[in-house]
């Protein structure tokens, strides 16, 4: 008997646990937080009766809407109390209106400062223009009118900042100013690079290194600066000078001779060189690249018979009387230049008269010719031929 009870005890214990679990499950299902009925049908009937009761006393609304209305009412009461408190301490206004008023004040203050600054700049600009007119009373009328138009335009621009067309014009003017400044900077940089290149390359001679000895509509004669002034590399060439000749078609360089040895080189074009001697004359046809040497004192002239191409040549001048100094004697310009090389006795014997008379008649005329040359009254050295 005892053995039978012991063998059945675990089974009874398991059945008891299952029974308790089922009772607890049924109890939990029938009770929801201890507030609603056990049966779903009873809960539904209770809800319907509650709604009918609320409808009799007033309009019915769900519970969550009532809670939202209560919160909104609390916020409204708090806002009204805050407004009353602000009214007691001073003039009241909504917070967003206060912020807008502050922004409006800042904007108005900024506009006033900007207008004051523009008026100040305009006044200063007009005063400077007035001072310039007083300092420069001889200015042209159109320059004064341009200044006045510029002042009016700036005034109109300051008054019409909000005009789209005015803003477009201002933007165009600023872009043009920036473009001009950029071009100016590029020009300056190019000039600096050119100068640096010239310093790096002493063998490069620009056109501004030449001195114009003669120029007219038919051509020019130019003298290059001394080589030793260009660089220390040319110190041994201080006794050498370079002369450039240019002549248009159908022109002639009038006869002359120079107190220096010449090495003539044709750079472009064709020429006929005629060399005069006491008993004869010789002519040479020269083309590009031809070179010829003329001794000091040789009288010669050049002709450009080409119909289209200009004649351009250079002379390497080697003075014989002084280092780096030479003089050209032009027969057509001043015949009395030849008298400089003769002494007083030779002149008296040649002209069979007193030196004072020779000096008065010939040398004074030579001095007048020299003064006329200094004043720019040069006789043509290059003339047109038919």
Curated annotation (Swiss-Prot):
Example of a GO cellular component annotation carried by this entry: aleurone grain
Protein name listed in UniProt: Convicilin
Region feature (Disordered): 33-199, 367-386
UniProt KW keywords: Seed storage protein, Signal, Storage protein, Vacuole
GO molecular function terms noted in the UniProt entry: nutrient reservoir activity
Residues annotated as domain Cupin type-1: 202-359
Superkingdom in the source lineage: Eukaryota
Species for this entry: Pisum sativum
Biased composition (Basic and acidic residues): 41-65, 74-91, 104-144, 153-186
Function: Seed storage protein.
N-terminal signal peptide: 1-29
Subcellular location: Vacuole, Aleurone grain; Vacuole
Keyword Chaperone: no
